[in-house]
Curated annotation (Swiss-Prot):
Keywords: Cytoplasm, Methyltransferase, rRNA processing, S-adenosyl-L-methionine, Transferase. It comes from Thermobifida fusca (strain YX). Residues 210-237 are annotated as: Disordered. This is Ribosomal RNA small subunit methyltransferase G. GO terms for molecular function: rRNA (guanine-N7-)-methyltransferase activity.
Length: 237
């Protein structure tokens, strides 16, 4: 299927000198990713516009040299894309499923991404171990649940960047109660990549304004995972 993975002129301009690495990643998604059920075959013709470029424009919101955790990384969207486009970032791909972490490790090795590590686990299992300036998430969970998983991973002043669709504003309203239960934060909906991608990428940004006090447990999600399995959420990853 790799013959269908041809970057547009807009993609060439956006990725610039990192395009060859991005092209190789797109080919891995179209070939190995499809074969292992990590991405649907119907997505291959639109890998660049709907997936890689949609993720890439989020880099506008990430400060230079930031530590990034890509929560529920799946096949590496957006974490691998951001690591390719921004070598200054230190990216942790956090993913609980073995078959996905195997693929992610293969990508990191084949693409020679020295700024990436793959960590197998669930967000709630690593709240005491990992911290970042930015947590990204795409097609992982409804916003109220995602907030409970992501915010404890953030340093003071850090932001959750949740890539969402047309219901972004509605999801944010539905998450107001959960936001109030967490440490102080500021939440908004922004659109990035105007003029580069059409439509622009919609992001719910939640920035925490205080540090998580030492010895203080983060407020748990109102909808915790059930023991013994991971409930399927959103699109197939």
């Amino acid at each position: 299927m790799t013959e269908h993975v041809v970057p547009s002129d807009a993609a060439r301009e956006l990725f610039g000198e990192t395009l060859p690495v991005a092209q190789r990643y797109a080919e891995l998604l179209a070939d190995v990713g499809v074969a292992r059920g990590l991405i649907g075959p119907r997505e291959v013709p639109r890998l660049w516009e709907r997936h890689l470029m949609n993720c890439a424009v989020v880099e506008e919101l990430i400060p230079k040299g930031a530590d990034v955790i890509d929560l529920g990384s799946g096949a590496g969207l957006p974490g691998v894309v951001l690591a390719i486009l921004r070598p200054d970032l230190s990216v942790t791909l956090l993913e609980p499923l073995l078959r996905r972490t195997v693929f992610l490790n293969e990508c990191v090795e084949l693409l020679r991404l020295d700024n990436v590590r793959v960590y197998r686990g669930r967000a709630e299992e690593v709240h005491a171990k990992l911290r970042a300036d930015i947590v990204t998430a795409r097609a992982v969970a409804p916003l109220p649940k995602l907030i409970g998983w992501a915010l404890p991973l953030l340093r003071k002043g850090g932001s959750l960047l949740a890539l969402k669709g047309e219901r972004a504003e509605a999801e944010l309203e539905e998450a107001r109660h959960e936001l109030a239960r967490q440490r102080p934060n500021i939440a908004d909906v922004i659109r990035v990549g105007g003029g580069k991608v059409d439509p622009a990428t919609t992001v719910v940004r939640v920035t925490v304004t205080t540090a998580l006090e030492t010895g203080t447990k983060a407020a748990p999600s109102r909808s915790p995972r059930k023991p013994g399995g991971r409930k399927k959420r959103g699109r197939k990853r």
